[in-house]
Structure formats: structure tokens, C-alpha cells
């Protein structure tokens, strides 16, 4: 619902904030919706950083907002599409992925995002097609090894693919599938008191998982969801 409270602590003014996003979307989300979710996150982030001392002075707030826009860089956006009808995180064809991926390319063209990637696409032939049929190939491919790898040879194939195409291979530990109500509430409610029902989610179309770092420094916000 957009209610996020982020405490960034003290940030050196010359160090840009590097943001990594992973967007989980269900089949109800269209490719055109992707930019909306990214813009919403940036708006919430900027509002969080420009509140308090700047709230009563529009000119100062505007200046601060421009500074923050320059410092807050979405360094990586990874797309995770919904599971198929067999309850596996797989993709039946490149034709299903491409419309969504092309929207990621538009975000790069608009300089809203620096790098883009996909999650849980471990079929080498499909990754080759993604390389051939896109203007901006994936900078990263994220895989959950335990659930996605059929054998050691598949891991080696992915590593070799990454080396050949200069693609960063990343490992994740997210629940697969992530957008089921039970799995999502389990992640969102971690740390809540037992019996808490305030943050329970009944219906969801998309979830953004984010991490924020200060360049040359440490992780400011390791992981969060909205």
C-alpha cells in the first residue's frame, strides 16, 4: 500500500545510492505496468528522503528532490515472472518473456535503470534466444540452485553461458513461487509478533524486493518488500 518507513542513517553527499530491485509479477500484470511499479518505488523513496526538515519549504524540498534523483540510481532490475500452471517457476516460450523484457529495455533507454536481468530462466536455449532477440541482453541471470538445477551439468552450462556472454550469474533464496499468498505473508510478516494480522496480504499482483547500498561503503538497507 506504499507505507514504507526507511531509515537511511547518515549518507555521505558525494556517494550515490545504488538500488537493486527484483520485481515479482503475476499474470494479471501487463508489460505496460512495469514502469508504473518502478516509478512508484522511486516516488516513495524520494518522499522518504525529503520529509522532515524539508517538508515546510517547497523550494528547498524541490532542490533536495533533484539532488536525491541524481543520487538514487537503480543499478539493477531483475524480473521474476509468475509460475506456470504446473506450479513450477518455468517459462513455456521466449514469446512469453519478450514483451516484459522489452519494457525493461525501455527503462534503460529512459535512464531509469542501468542494468536489467531475469530470474529463474535456466534453459540455455531460451537464454540464447533472449540474447539474440533483444537489443539489451541481460546483465544478470538469477537462479535458485536448489529448486532450479536438475544436475551439476546444468550449473556448469549456466556458468559457461555467463562467461561466454559476460553475464553475471546470481544465486537467490526467495521462495518459489513467491507470489502465493502463504509464501508472501511468510516473508512480509517475519519479525512481527506472534498472532499479528496487521500486515497480512490477501491479494497481490506484484511485489518489489529492494536493497540499497552506498557506493564504496556498506549496505544501508539489506532487504525489504513493498
Task: Give the positions of each predicted feature.
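Short beta-strand segments at enzyme active-site cores
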Residues: 19-20, 74-80, 116-118
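Beta/alpha (TIM)-barrel catalytic core signal, keyed to glycine-rich beta->alpha loops juxtaposed to Asp/Glu
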Residues: 81-226
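Eukaryotic N-terminal low-complexity, Ser/Thr- and Lys/Arg-rich leader segments
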Residues: 1-14, 32, 36, 46-67, ...
Amino acid at each position: 500500500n506504499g507505507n514504507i518507513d526507511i531509515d537511511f542513517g547518515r549518507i555521505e553527499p558525494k556517494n550515490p545510492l545504488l538500488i537493486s530491485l527484483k520485481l515479482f509479477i503475476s499474470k494479471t500484470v501487463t508489460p505496460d505496468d512495469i514502469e508504473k511499479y518502478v516509478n512508484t518505488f522511486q516516488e516513495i523513496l524520494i518522499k522518504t528522503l525529503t520529509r522532515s526538515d524539508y517538508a515546510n519549504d517547497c523550494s528547498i524540498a524541490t532542490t533536495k528532490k533533484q539532488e536525491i534523483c541524481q543520487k538514487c540510481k537503480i543499478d539493477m532490475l531483475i524480473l521474476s515472472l509468475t509460475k506456470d500452471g504446473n506450479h513450477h517457476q518455468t517459462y513455456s516460450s521466449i514469446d512469453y518473456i519478450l514483451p516484459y523484457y522489452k519494457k525493461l529495455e525501455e527503462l534503460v533507454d529512459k535512464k531509469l535503470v542501468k542494468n536489467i536481468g531475469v530470474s529463474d530462466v535456466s534453459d540455455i536455449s531460451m537464454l540464447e534466444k533472449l540474447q539474440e532477440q533483444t537489443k539489451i541482453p541481460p546483465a544478470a541471470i538469477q537462479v535458485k540452485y536448489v529448486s532450479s538445477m536438475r544436475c551439476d551439468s546444468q550449473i556448469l552450462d549456466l556458468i559457461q553461458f555467463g562467461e561466454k556472454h559476460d553475464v553475471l550469474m546470481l544465486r537467490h533464496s526467495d521462495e518459489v513461487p513467491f507470489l502465493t499468498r502463504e509464501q508472501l505473508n511468510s516473508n512480509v510478516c517475519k519479525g512481527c509478533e506472534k498472532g499479528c494480522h496487521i500486515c497480512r496480504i490477501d491479494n497481490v499482483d506484484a511485489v518489489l524486493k529492494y536493497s540499497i547500498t552506498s557506493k564504496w561503503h556498506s549496505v544501508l538497507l539489506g532487504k525489504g518488500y513493498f
